[in-house]
Amino acid sequence: MAKLTKRMRVIREKVDATKEYGITEAVALLKELATAKFVESVDVAVNLGIDARKSDQNVRGATVLPNGTGRTVRVAVFTQGANAEAATAAGADLVGMEDLAEQVKRGELNFDVVIASPDAMRVVGQLGQILGPRGLMPNPKVGTVTPNVAEAVKNAKAGQVRYRNDKNGIIHSTIGKVDFTEAQLKENLESLLVALKKAKPSTSKGQFIKKVSLSTTMGAGMAVDQASLDTKAA
């Protein structure tokens, strides 16, 4: 059996894998156990009551977290004309059409989000094999193919997270950093869960959000008691 590291031993002693923690206790534990030499992200895994094998039950979308993610996001925009000027004014890091596509083909992928206006998809479509596997391909379902590229840029910069269930019906996302306050992390988590509830497929029956777990980049996961959260959709 592999020898446990000191960090893993501490986590095993502190975290009860059979317990659901109230959000206050969960965040306090996450902060206590986040001892890496960098500011760790706080990640969430949400088990949904869906059959991921059925396309009409898959959940996909995007939402802007009220307190952002703590990450600096570089945004590339495929567009032209007035939209290009608007994207630049909104804070886009890279704006272009064929010239930007050539950069991508050369492997220059120094961006985290790709946005495109509908008229630019003829150019972006040629980059599917490069952008697709990296989760960067623009898609209207998550608001990254849109005539309003300026708004999309602002959302991306403000802390928008995109979500999509995996083959096990689990959504993985980030809700901030360990140096966020408890209130900021709680508000971000509640905002994400409200967005997921609104995205519930009509064919999904029974309990939709079955389990919510929080973890840090280098830490163990812990289940969160949903009763400690306010996830009533406005």
UniProtKB/Swiss-Prot annotation:
GO terms for biological process: regulation of translation; translation. GO terms for cellular component: cytosolic large ribosomal subunit. Keywords: Repressor, Ribonucleoprotein, Ribosomal protein, RNA-binding, rRNA-binding, Translation regulation, tRNA-binding. Pfam families: Ribosomal_L1. The keyword Coiled coil does not apply. GO terms for molecular function: rRNA binding; structural constituent of ribosome; tRNA binding. The keyword Acetylation does not apply. InterPro entries: Ribosom_uL1_bac-type (IPR005878), Ribosomal_uL1 (IPR002143), Ribosomal_uL1-like (IPR023674), Ribosomal_uL1/biogenesis (IPR028364), Ribosomal_uL1_3-a/b-sand (IPR016095), Ribosomal_uL1_CS (IPR023673). Part of the 50S ribosomal subunit. Belongs to the universal ribosomal protein uL1 family. Binds directly to 23S rRNA. The L1 stalk is quite mobile in the ribosome, and is involved in E site tRNA release. This is Large ribosomal subunit protein uL1. The gene is rplA.
